[in-house]
Amino acid sequence: MTGSTPLLPRYALGNWWSRYWPYTSDEYLNLIDRFKTEKIPLSIGVLDMDWHITDIPTRFGSGWTGYSWNRNLIPNPEQLLQQLHDRKLKLSLNVHPADGIRAYEEAYPRVAKRLGLNVELEEPAIFDFFNPSFREAYFKDVHYKLEKQGVDFWWIDWQQGTQGMLDPLWLLNHYHYQDSCKNSEGGLILSRYAGPGSHRYPVGFSGDTIISWNSLRFQPYFTATASNIGYSWWSHDIGGHMLGDYDEELQTRWLQFGVFSPITRLHSSRSPFNSKEPWFFSETTSKIMKKYLRLRHQMIPYLYNNMIQLIQITVTPRVMFIPECNILTILLMMKCIDMLL
């Protein structure tokens, strides 16, 4: 009814590093090099919203939406992205598109020309994904320029302002994913759930997780039940994103679960106590974390093979197929057989 799950690029099955932190170019490169020194493999690096200018004049509103590099932190974006690619790392940037494209943005002159905006009055390009002209400007004048610099895919973090009968996040996921399919390695985005059919635009994520045992306790259930609506490639902030207390046992157990989750994406907030670098923990915890992160990359051939099977072989859930059977009968009947329960 809603379509199959697409094939992910192979690199998406590896370890993701993400943190809400104002990295400078040197800090980020040193971090990635430290992972290599520690023999911890990474496939994807994610720069949260501080990659772009956030401290903007009050007349433009908030700094959550942005598309212009913060050159105080990243003075030469092309060089940074090339250096990351030289290290075999894919890069994703975080975007909050709700506030449109405003006059302080580097891309604004191109956008204003395409949309016929009054530049002298700093007329903004209001976010409207229902408008084909805005979508064209959004991709061609803003995102394509950044992709040309080396951005591999986009993290669509949030979208407010529902219009009409359709959530704009659904449109963002649809058009962003379809656009990303132009890449030779296949389409990929990271975004929140926007309703039934969202599994067609992987990867999804659950939003900010609280650092607590209760939160970890919920994640296996949440991840498994995402498949009930077809969301195979579901992720969450492994280790927790915010609040909570420093707890090495919690971090260890969470990472162990995360490595066997569909997507292994470490993420945390700006707090200096929440970061997930394995070498920041005790020797015992660090050793375990490194072991499991290495294991994830050893599993990639197995995961990729099963991903292909997921796409090629579609199966009716057994509970729906044999509704008259009770769950115990079904479990006994399907024991040791590959089947969706």
List PLM regions with ranges.
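Catalytic-domain carbohydrate-binding cleft regions of carbohydrate-active enzymes
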Residues: 1-341
